[in-house]
A protein has these predicted regions:
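Coil-to-beta-strand transition motifs
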Residues: 18, 93-95, 195-199, 211-214
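A long amphipathic alpha-helix within ATP-dependent nucleotide-binding catalytic cores
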Residues: 168-200
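Active-site loop/lid in soluble adenylation, ligation, and acyl-transfer enzymes
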Residues: 1-145, 258-287
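Conserved metal-phosphate-binding beta-hairpin within the catalytic cores
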Residues: 100, 199-220
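Anionic ligand-binding catalytic core segments
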Residues: 114-117, 123-172, 216, 220-281
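Intrinsically disordered, low-complexity acidic/polar segments
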Residues: 30, 109-110, 211, 225-227
């Protein structure tokens, strides 16, 4: 059985009236697939997504059917698919990456220093790096193909972009994307903080089901799609340590002559961070 689509870090298989999404142990940074594999990374992403999908059903339904390979075709009942595979409903995915920022960091901080704005949104003066924002902000982007970069767009541009694909529904869909993104972030960020983790920012993706209703797709609040910081020791004014692939990003930035290969020590520390965030948030250990 071959995947119908292979993303940077995921393979998607057609299962008739459903899809099976396999989160691989590949790692990508700056939209480039690195040469390393990070053992258990795919399992963390799948199981953490399941955790959040279960928690947020009161806000919006999601595409998850099962993460148990026993519910999947025989092909997936192999050890390499156990734990990192999710059977999902088929959706018509919306062409927007829904980014929400609760703290100012990364590209948002760089933009704010230059212009006082992030993705066209004016922020208060005098913010320091890693400061909590007065309210979370929604900063959508377009979806890039492999090898390209996502492009930040304004809310108004997101309406026009959606209108091209869904004539007559651009404004309605853009508003639903924004409102659901903020609602999901607020609920999950509050929970995570109670477990000792700050969700600085994250990305959601949504699709429409067969009745045209909005559904959460892709993965949700994983170390691949989010910036997780330890709440203990949080101090604005500089970058924060993190539980996500920022560790790998930082090494690549500090070593520009790399050939997109991380030292084993960085790989080991990266998976340690992934596992630690999973255990803190869910209260469970991965087998």
């Amino acid at each position: 059985m071959k995947p119908i689509k292979e993303g940077k870090v995921r393979e998607i298989y057609d299962n008739g009236d459903s899809l099976i999404m396999v989160a691989t142990d590949r790692i990508s940074c700056f939209d480039v697939i690195l040469n390393n594999q990070v053992t258990k990374k795919g399992t963390v992403r799948t199981q953490m997504s399941k955790f959040w999908f279960d928690m947020t059903q009161d806000i919006l339904p999601n595409h998850m059917i099962s993460v148990d390979v026993k519910d999947m075709p025989e092909f997936f009942q192999q050890e390499k698919f156990d734990g990192n595979s999710m059977m999902c409903r088929k959706l018509e995915m919306l062409p927007i990456e829904c980014i929400v920022r609760g703290y100012i960091t990364g590209s948002g901080w760089a933009s704010y220093k230059e212009t006082g704005k992030v993705c066209g949104i004016t922020l208060p003066e005098g913010l320091k790096e890693s400061d909590k924002l007065p309210e979370p902000i929604y900063t959508p982007s377009t979806k890039a193909e492999i090898g390209d970069h996502d492009e930040n767009i304004s809310y108004e541009q997101s309406i026009a972009h959606l209108e091209k694909y869904f004539p007559g529904r651009g404004e309605e869909l853009a508003a639903k994307l924004r409102d659901n993104t903020i609602a999901l972030y607020k609920k999950c960020a509050e929970y995570a903080l109670s477990k000792g983790i700050i969700i600085a920012d994250t990305k959601f993706e949504f699709g429409l089901d067969e009745n045209g209703n909005m559904v959460i797709g892709d993965e949700m609040l994983t170390p691949d799609s989010s910036r997780f910081w330890p709440a203990e020791g949080y101090e604005p004014g500089h970058g924060q340590p993190s539980f996500d692939k920022q560790f790998a990003r930082d090494w690549l930035k500090a070593n520009p002559d790399n050939d997109w290969t991380l030292p084993q020590e960085i790989v080991d520390k990266t998976i340690e961070k992934y596992l630690q965030s999973y255990e803190m948030l869910t209260g469970k250990k991965l087998d």
